[in-house]
Curated annotation (Swiss-Prot):
Signal peptide: none annotated. It comes from Ruegeria sp. (strain TM1040). Part of the 50S ribosomal subunit; part of the 5S rRNA/L5/L18/L25 subcomplex. Contacts the 5S rRNA and the P site tRNA. Forms a bridge to the 30S subunit in the 70S ribosome. Pfam families: Ribosomal_L5, Ribosomal_L5_C. This is Large ribosomal subunit protein uL5. GO terms for biological process: translation.
Length: 187
């Protein structure tokens, strides 16, 4: 059994031992601090119309996101009222969580090795979903691809946004970093 004090996530070890050197060689960085690294991963579930009809749906989404992330999720609320959608200011609309450090590496490992292969008709993620500043965004149609979610106990399958923020300056650097972590790009 591993001691919690000595445990290091697999992808963090891979980054320190292999990826840093490969990126430094590929892009010709002169300083160690120039080498891109993962900064944070933000997970978001928006309930939309379901939350308007039943406020318990946002609570359910928050609980599911907490299970997936291994960290308590925040409930997101409507910033302003929109009468046409029957939305009131302060109404719970979904959940979000920001992962950093070891939990971030653990989540990325589970996403790439366990969750993505469980997606129906999966052919890789888009290689063009970068924002121009080295951050990558992807969406999942169903959050039930994560093994933490018991399919029989959920009332609704939610879509999910995942944003991977890196310290890379360009999209090419960020893509090389994520490819080194075995992110399955289709292009």
């Amino acid at each position: 059994m591993l001691d919690d004090a000595t445990y290091t996530p697999r992808l963090k070890t891979l980054y320190k031992d292999t990826i840093r050197g490969a990126l430094k060689e590929e892009f010709g960085y002169k300083n160690e601090m120039q080498i891109p690294k993962l900064d944070k991963i933000v997970l978001n579930i928006g309930c939309g119309r379901a939350a308007v009809k039943d406020s318990k749906k946002a609570k359910s989404a928050q609980e599911d996101l907490t299970k997936i992330a291994g960290q308590k999720a925040l409930t997101t609320v409507a910033k302003n009222s929109i009468a046409g959608f029957r939305v009131r200011e302060g109404m719970p609309m979904g959940a979000k969580v920001t992962l950093r450090g070891e939990r971030m590496y653990e989540f990325l490992d589970r996403l790439i090795t366990i969750a993505m292969p469980r997606i129906r008709d999966f052919r890789g993620v888009s290689g063009t979903s970068f924002d121009g500043r080295g951050n990558y965004a992807l969406g999942l149609k169903e959050h039930i691809v994560f093994p933490e979610i018991d399919f029989d106990k959920i009332d609704e399958a939610w879509g999910m946004d995942i944003v991977i923020a890196t310290t890379a300056n360009t999209d090419a650097e960020a893509k090389a970093l994520l490819k080194a972590f075995n992110m399955p790009f289709n292009s």
